[in-house]
C-alpha cells in the first residue's frame, strides 16, 4: 500500500468512499442524504487542502484531508483540522485507517502544526483515542429530531 497526494480527478471516488464508510455504521439512508453535502469532496477541496489517499493494487482504499490553518506570528499557535479520514468498508479493520492517521500526523508535524483537532463520528471515537487523541468537548449534531453529540478531539502530532 502507498499513501500519496490525491488528484483533483479523484474527488468523486473520495466522496463515494466517505458515503459508503458512513453507511457502514448502519445509519438510516435519510440521515446519509442529510450528511451528503458534508461528505462530498470537491475537486477544489482536493486542490486547496492536504488530501492523501491510501492506494493498493491500483485501487483507492481510503483517504484523509488535513486542513491547515494560517501561519501565526508564533508558529506554535498553528492548528489543523482533520476534516476527513475514511476507509472503504471492505478494508475497515485492516490497518489502513491507522496508516492514514499516522501519515496525517507526520505531515502535520512537518507543517509545524501544534494541534490537530477533529469532530469524530461516535463510532470512530474509540479509534482516535487509541491513536492518542483526547476529548476536549462535544459538538451538537442534531438530526431528524434526534439529539446527537459528536466528540471533539485533539492530538498533538
Locate predicted features.
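Acetyl-CoA-dependent GNAT
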Residues: 8-11, 15-90, 101-103, 107, ...
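Conserved N-terminal entry element of GNAT/NAT acetyltransferase domains
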Residues: 1-9, 157
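Conserved G/P- and acidic residue-centered "switch" motifs that form tight phosphate/ATP-binding loops
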Residues: 95
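Conserved GNAT acetyl-CoA-binding A-motif
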Residues: 108-121
Amino acid at each position: 500500500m502507498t499513501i500519496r497526494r490525491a488528484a483533483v480527478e479523484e474527488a468523486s471516488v473520495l466522496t463515494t468512499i466517505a458515503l459508503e464508510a458512513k453507511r457502514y455504521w448502519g445509519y438510516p439512508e435519510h440521515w446519509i442524504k442529510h450528511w451528503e453535502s458534508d461528505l462530498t469532496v470537491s475537486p477544489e477541496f482536493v486542490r486547496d487542502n492536504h488530501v492523501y489517499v491510501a492506494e493498493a493494487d491500483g485501487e483507492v482504499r481510503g483517504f484523509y484531508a488535513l486542513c491547515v490553518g494560517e501561519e501565526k506570528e508564533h508558529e506554535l499557535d498553528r492548528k489543523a483540522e482533520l476534516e476527513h479520514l475514511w476507509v472503504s468498508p471492505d478494508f475497515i479493520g485492516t490497518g489502513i485507517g491507522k496508516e492514514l492517521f499516522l501519515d496525517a500526523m507526520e505531515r502535520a508535524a512537518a507543517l509545524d502544526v501544534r494541534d490537530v483537532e477533529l469532530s469524530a463520528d461516535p463510532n470512530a471515537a474509540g479509534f482516535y483515542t487509541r491513536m492518542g487523541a483526547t476529548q476536549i468537548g462535544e459538538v451538537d449534531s442534531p438530526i431528524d429530531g434526534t439529539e446527537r453529540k459528536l466528540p471533539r478531539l485533539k492530538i498533538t502530532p
